[in-house]
Curated annotation (Swiss-Prot):
Domain of life according to the entry: Eukaryota
PROSITE patterns tied to this protein: AMP_BINDING
Region of interest: SBD1: 271-340
Record remark on domains: Both substrate-binding domains (SBD1 and SBD2) are involved in the substrate recognition, and are sufficient to confer the substrate specificity.
Record organism: Vanilla planifolia (Vanilla)
Amino acids binding CoA: 269, 452-453
UniProt catalytic activity: (E)-4-coumarate + ATP + CoA = (E)-4-coumaroyl-CoA + AMP + diphosphate; (E)-4-coumarate + ATP + H(+) = (E)-4-coumaroyl-AMP + diphosphate; (E)-4-coumaroyl-AMP + CoA = (E)-4-coumaroyl-CoA + AMP + H(+)
Biological role: Carboxylate--CoA ligase that may use 4-coumarate as substrate. Follows a two-step reaction mechanism, wherein the carboxylate substrate first undergoes adenylation by ATP, followed by a thioesterification in the presence of CoA to yield the final CoA thioester.
SUPFAM superfamilies: Acetyl-CoA synthetase-like
GO biological process: phenylpropanoid metabolic process
CDD domains noted in UniProt: 4CL
Protein known as: 4-coumarate--CoA ligase
Top EC class, one word: ligase
Pathway stated in the Swiss-Prot or TrEMBL entry: Phytoalexin biosynthesis; 3,4',5-trihydroxystilbene biosynthesis; 3,4',5-trihydroxystilbene from trans-4-coumarate: step 1/2
Length: 553
């Protein structure tokens, strides 16, 4: 009998929860209503600040313009459940378009404006976008497709030629609409509001259906409650330099900032000097970054010329941040708490958040990427058996809660592979939870290098490589090897004005790791390919290895 009980106990999931208590979340509210629920407290305060022009929109302005855009979209035939594509860099118009679509129950699919025409059109087709909002310089990418398929194009600025202008509407067509004529719609909490595209744990990009309830839950998990996990308030200024077409910026910067009544300083793209100037000029208090930005700050020689003392929070996400890089950037922001979050588009996206960011903060460890968010459950499972694992045992990270995606658009098979029958979303990331409930990411399940059966985590080697002063960036991927199966190889970007050889790099790593983690080859490159989120595009590097032998110098 005792043996049977023991076996039954083993079958039970070991579930981890936040140190913070669960809170009430108004899941019945549409996303826009939730974001503007407390607007009466800060309607006249700055909401959006355009870093390029210094133009300021108050909360009252943003809410009104978004309603007008919703009305304008409706006049152009966009109905509840229809999808619009936002093909824009960071800009106030991006925000107005997204919120305007939400007001009328429509869906926004966000695309990287630097995509090729083929990539943009593929997403437009897959999402069945009825209208594309873009800039004049990107119109040529979609013009022919739009004409052939009856898709309307709206440009936020002038178009490139008179011929284009005749067929393309200006954004003022939306902002000039009467907000009182916006249709009244009943929006279901399970209605889709955002459709970002993600490759998930494997395969081609797929539309991730994020609902009103899901995004409301995710934002609330971060910024709501008496002791918010991510403390923001109406005196804060958030620097929105990460692209809004990526869910990290859309959720944890824009939507969280709106809910908290903070000022959101919009920067179109990251350049170190304008970035530092804006922080100093607007006294930025919260900096949501990704590792490439953190790396640029840590390595920059001009940072010390600027007053960054206003920054109280530096949050990094989208990819793991090593302890050495954490320590380096701490020195640049004397008054800031530095910590990490962990997310995945399909998870809504935030799974874990650093508790040093809480209103009543907790002590944290370097290298940890937070504790599971409140109102959610996390477990770690053995990738081979699916059995849940106890603390300090690495396995695949799984999350369950109302914040996760509804599923992949028109792809029930991929949805079923990602979300199991019990509602657990399988991330494809390998990590463990320690004795203090902190989550540590080891690596991506599919990125682990197998050396004679030993697992080698690329992120670990990359963090070591970045500690060398002659290396400005690095990525590690597997290379096929007859004897070992796979061996680690490094792609390295040399720091300006520095020189280093392949042998020097190999020796530098060999002194710090066990034999099977040693770097086998080093390839020097001009840049490491990365997604807008900051994640290394390892498949591109693996493809280069497969295509041809690369010179080492």
């Amino acid at each position: 009998m005792a043996a049977a009980v023991a076996i039954e106990e083993q079958k039970k999931d070991i579930i981890f929860r936040s140190k913070l208590p669960d809170i009430y979340i108004p899941k019945n509210l549409p996303l826009h209503s939730y974001c503007f629920e407390n607007i009466s407290k800060f309607s006249s305060r700055p909401c959006l600040i355009n870093g390029a022009t210094d133009e300021i929109f108050t909360y009252a302005d943003v809410e009104l313009i978004s309603r007008r855009v919703g009305s304008g979209l409706s006049k152009l035939g966009i109905k509840q459940g229809d999808t619009i594509m936002i093909l824009l860099p960071n800009s106030p118009e991006f925000v107005f378009a997204f919120l305007g679509a939400s007001f009328i129950g429509s869906i926004s699919t966000m695309a990287n404006p630097f995509f090729t025409s083929t990539e943009v059109i593929k997403q437009a087709k897959a999402s069945n976008a009825k209208l594309i909002i873009t800039q004049g310089c990107y119109v040529d990418k979609v013009k022919d497709y739009a004409c052939e398929n009856g898709v309307k194009i709206i440009s936020i600025d002038t178009t490139t030629t008179a011929d284009d202008a005749a067929n393309i509407l200006h954004f003022s067509e939306l902002t000039g609409a009467d907000e009182n004529e916006m249709p009244k719609v009943e929006i279901s909490p399970d209605g889709v509001v955002a459709l970002p595209y993600s490759s998930g744990t494997t395969g081609l990009p797929k539309g991730v259906m994020l609902t009103h309830k899901g995004l409301v839950t995710s934002v609330a998990q971060q910024v709501d409650g008496e002791n918010p996990n991510l403390y923001m308030h109406s005196d804060d200024v958030l620097l929105c330099v990460l692209p809004l077409f990526h869910i990290y910026s859309l959720n944890s910067v824009l939507l969280c900032g709106l809910r908290a009544g903070s000022g959101i300083l919009i920067m179109q793209k990251f350049e170190i000097v304008p970035f530092l100037e804006l922080i100093q000029k607007y006294k930025v208090t919260i900096g949501p970054f990704v590792p490439p930005i953190v790396l640029a700050i840590a390595k920059s020689t001009v940072v010390d010329n600027y007053d960054l003392s206003s920054v109280r929070t530096v949050m990094s996400g989208a990819a793991p941040l090593g302890k050495e890089l954490e320590d380096a950037v701490r020195a640049k922001f004397p008054n800031a708490k530095l910590g990490q979050g962990y997310g995945m588009t399909e998870a809504g996206p935030v799974l874990a958040m650093c508790l040093a960011f809480a209103k009543e903060p907790f002590d944290i460890k370097s290298g940890a990427c937070g504790t599971v968010v409140r109102n959610a459950e996390m477990k770690i499972v053995d990738p081979e058996t699916g059995s849940s694992l106890p603390r300090n045992h690495p396995g695949e990270i799984c999350i369950r809660g109302d914040q996760i995606m509804k599923g992949y658009l028109n792809d029930p098979e991929a949805t079923a592979r990602t979300i199991d029958k019990e509602g657990w979303l399988h991330t494809g990331d390998i990590g463990y939870i320690d004795d203090d409930d902190e989550l540590f990411i080891v690596d991506r399940l599919k990125e682990l290098i197998k050396y004679k059966g030993f697992q080698v985590a690329p992120a670990e080697l990359e963090a070591l490589l970045l500690t060398h002063p002659c290396i400005s960036d690095a990525a590690v991927v597997p290379m096929k090897d007859e004897a070992a199966g796979e061996v680690p190889v490094a792609f390295v970007v040399k720091s300006n004005g520095h020189n280093i050889t392949e042998d020097e790099i190999k020796q530098f790593i060999s002194k710090q790791v066990i034999f099977y983690k040693r770097i086998n080859r080093v390839f020097f490159v001009e840049a490491i390919p990365k997604a807008p989120s900051g994640k290394i595009l390892r498949k591109d590097l693996r493809a280069r290895l497969a295509a041809a032998a690369l010179p080492t110098n």
